[in-house]
Amino acid sequence: MARQITLFDFTLKKEQNKDESRKEEIPHANINEERRKPKEWIKEAEEGKSYFLLQVDYDGKKSKAICKLYDKETKKIYILYDNTGHKPYFLTDIDPEKVNKIPKVVRDPSFDHLETVIKIDPYSGNKIKLTKIVVKDPLAVRRMRNSVPKAYEAHIKYFNNYIYDLGLIPGLPYVVKKGKLEQLRPELKGEEVDEIRKAFADSDEMTKEAVNDWIPIFESEVPDVKRVAIDIEVYTPIKGRIPDPEKAEFPIISISLAGNDGTKRVLVLLREDVNSQITKHDVIVETFKSERELIRRFFDIILDYPIILTFNGDDFDIPYIYYRALKLNFTPEEIPFDIINDEGKYLAGIHIDLYKFFFNRAIRNYAFEGKYNEYNLDAVATALLGMSKVKLDTLISFLDLDKLIEYNSRDAEITLKLTTFNNNLVWKLIILLARISKMGLEELTRTEVSTWIKNLYYWEHRRRNWLIPLKEEILTRSSQIKTAAIIKGKRYKGAVVIDPPAGVFFNVVVLDFASLYPSIIRNWNISYETVDVENCKNKEYVRDETGEVLHYICKDKPGITAVITGLLRDFRVKVYKKKAKSQNISEEQRSVYDVVQRAMKVFINATYGVFGAENFPLYAPAVAESVTAIGRYVITTTVNYCRSIGLQVLYGDTDSMFLWNPSKEKLEEIIKFVKGKFGLDLEVDKVYKFVAFSGLKKNYLGVYPDGKTDIKGMLAKKRNTPEFIKKEFNEVKQLVTTINSPDDIPKIRDQLEYKIKEIYEKLRHKGYNLDELAFRVMLSKPLESYTKNTPQHVKAALQLRSYGVMVLPRDIIMFVKVKSKDGVKPVQLAKLSEIDVDKYIDAVRSTFEQILKAFGLIGANLLQLLSILSLT
């Protein structure tokens, strides 16, 4: 404890004494004090110069939209204020005369004026007249929208509204002409354009027109923007406690920076209570006797960078720096950061919190194919980079400076490399996603894929001058759901699943419908304004797997969802997947095209899930139900055809079928059948040496010819499974991969039985340590929010808090199961002697019985194996 007091006294108290005279001259820093104007941090863009648009914000002091532009020559951010006179607004369907009689609108201090505008009804294609209520302040829209019967386009952030109206696309290059942004189109060779147009030769006219607008999105240069990753280390007096950023009561002891310009730098505080000897490092080390001077130096360095990268910087690094600087008597005008809506804003450029980007499920599942299961820096970096954080055996507070520098610099290095590895894959992906979604970098990297898709479709509505319909109007105009859900919590029947047998099957081929739901949306012209609409001449009926008619789709005109989804799918499949594999271009260009197709994959695969979600603003129940019904019809029809030609379908789930020992000729026949009947692409996705089915849906272990495994649904794959189970399961998995024929099964069965006994004995004799026994579960919300029930990890977190440990949302809680009232204890408070062995035996049984059931059908005495785990 003496060490803790010494350090605290040495930093904060000395800083306070040193700055007493400064306090007399400079008023105490107030968070609400007027901040330095943005243009003092960033220079304005010049007429005639070209830039990349990265972000659009709103400057409340000037009451104008502000574009943040990157100059790849100077490597700096510049700003361009709106000079079109654009103002915030929303629409209503009542006449201006009636609006003028609503005092809460026209007497509001922010009311500006009314206009009459013409929009197109997405359903009928007819022109409709609306009143545009123009205001001076975006917040006024929120106040006024409830004062009119129907307020259209009144829940859109102002900077997004600005992007829609001006047709801007963040991530693309522009030139400043007469104070406005004019898009620069890439120069393509004639054969490249011909190749793209050929891919869309059979498309409708709306799609063909859209193709020309989308080419720059995929073909324009992706700038390698100058950026720096930062990471701070803060003194912590108690093990496990995360310092509160808003209180910022403990000193910052080091800040590391790693830039894509080669910068590697650590700013470190010299302290009397730790070994301050510094040996040679591969980073530049700057030492400071004063924490205030360390922070001031940090501010000076980062102003040279237009982009700052952090990992969880919104929640910790940026707010801690900001509030700590205020506490050390920096004025707000001296601090190039601000905290707005719980986001850490970098006033001299753009701040990207990579934690939130990698936390996005669409990025994890579609862009990186589930390579990481946890979202902390160490887990993501290990999975994607093969690098990990420096391991520590003591508190950061007590590290000697040498170890602190190594630890701190590694974190910044890893954070930067997450955007630079594999030819800047992640950075390019962010830019491409910004272009597709029409979102600025800061909002894109902090929001879910549903927001990206919503933004894309709103932008497309505005480009066509379509009125963006109200959610309640879509629900009213959409017909009712006709099917009952099988899964609890769903409103309509979902995908068809063919129950798998329990057993081991050799030579299994998996056929996959390429992007099934997006392809159905495109091929059947499904969109909220095409399903069950009135006054339709050309109808196509939607039938489910039983032949029952559920809905009809209007083919009079292309639906917007069908056009955009089909366009992205065809760009990916027909153009960029091929380019990413082409040997006629450079490796660098291939990597760019690979990023392009990955970005489209994210949108394509997420489309149905988003449009089928009830909270999505363009959700129509009949649309979601039509897609799944057609999917069931396609799968059922295909399975029946397979069986009619002698193919045995072992298992089927949503968009795939597992076929047992099919011939090449039969595979070609079924692929041809699907293409001819449905216009869908059926592909060979996987070929297994064998598959072990447990008999449960979405639950199997497949082994490829090269010995690699593919595990689905088994508990040992779950990220909260204790390490000892994962380790033992991996050993079992290695045993199973040695199987080459049914003749190998008896030997493996004996080895499995021995392994089960070994695990049991090790548990009974406390052969595993606490870390190996720990369950790891992320805390998804503040502890106070758990009011209805208290999950086990929350019980453990509450115990930690009772010992003074700060526990925050997104913390990973490590706990073990013990014999006590709560039944659990956090690892930090538990003893090995307290472990409830029976609970762990249950966990082992539930994990291993899934794989043992597969072998039970070919001779293994399953009941005997499982009964071993019931012995007491």
From Swiss-Prot:
Presence of the UniProt keyword Transport in the record: no
Gene3D superfamilies: 1.10.287.1390, DNA Polymerase, chain B, domain 1, Helix hairpin bin, Palm domain of DNA polymerase, Ribonuclease H-like superfamily/Ribonuclease H
Catalytic activity, reaction form: DNA(n) + a 2'-deoxyribonucleoside 5'-triphosphate = DNA(n+1) + diphosphate
Top EC class, one word: transferase
InterPro entries in alphabetical order: DNA-dir_DNA_pol_B (IPR006172), DNA-dir_DNA_pol_B_CS (IPR017964), DNA-dir_DNA_pol_B_exonuc (IPR006133), DNA-dir_DNA_pol_B_multi_dom (IPR006134), DNA/RNA_pol_sf (IPR043502), DNA_pol_palm_dom_sf (IPR023211), DNA_pol_type-B (IPR050240), RNaseH-like_sf (IPR012337)
Family membership: Belongs to the DNA polymerase type-B family.
Classification via PANTHER family: DNA POLYMERASE 1 (PTHR10322:SF20), DNA POLYMERASE CATALYTIC SUBUNIT (PTHR10322)
Name of protein: DNA polymerase 1
Species per Swiss-Prot/TrEMBL record: Sulfurisphaera ohwakuensis
Lineage, opening ranks: Archaea, Thermoproteota, Thermoprotei, Sulfolobales, Sulfolobaceae
Gene responsible for this protein: pol-alpha
